[in-house]
Amino acid sequence: DEDVVAQVPPSAKHFNVLLHTLDRMKAERPGRLIQNITRLAEHFKRRSIVALISDLYENPEDLLEALKPYNYLGNDVVVFHVLDPAEIDFPYREPSRFVDLESGEDVPVVPEGFAKQYRELVQAHIEALRTRCTEARIDYVLLNTARPLDEALFSYLGNRERLARVR
């Protein structure tokens, strides 16, 4: 969204509130992810786990630059990159019209000759995000929308807890 539309105070007791808040979110207007990330950094006064959940249609360098202050403040940052399987695989074979959920723009697409290039660009973007996050010591998790978000979050937190015990 263009602005921060909801904020849940940090607390282990607020996890269910966080999940319900996320469940109610709808893509309604164009987003300004980088500006909102930058603006929210000042609200983190104590060490926290900062989870960014987004489709990440942003420049990887700009995104990582916006996330740097969170690391500097001692936060553990995890980026959940949420994509629909069709956004990754582009399974379409017939000419189609796509509607951008944020802008409402109608985009005609002829898949022939476009699908291969599209898949390559998406994979390159995913890999750039993964690489930049790893370099910045930020956890990167690619999430498929076919998997429930709460299940993915619990799985990540469980893996994180197991790794902490090993260290």
Residue ranges and their predicted role:
Residues D1-R167:
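Exposed, interaction-prone extracellular/peripheral surfaces
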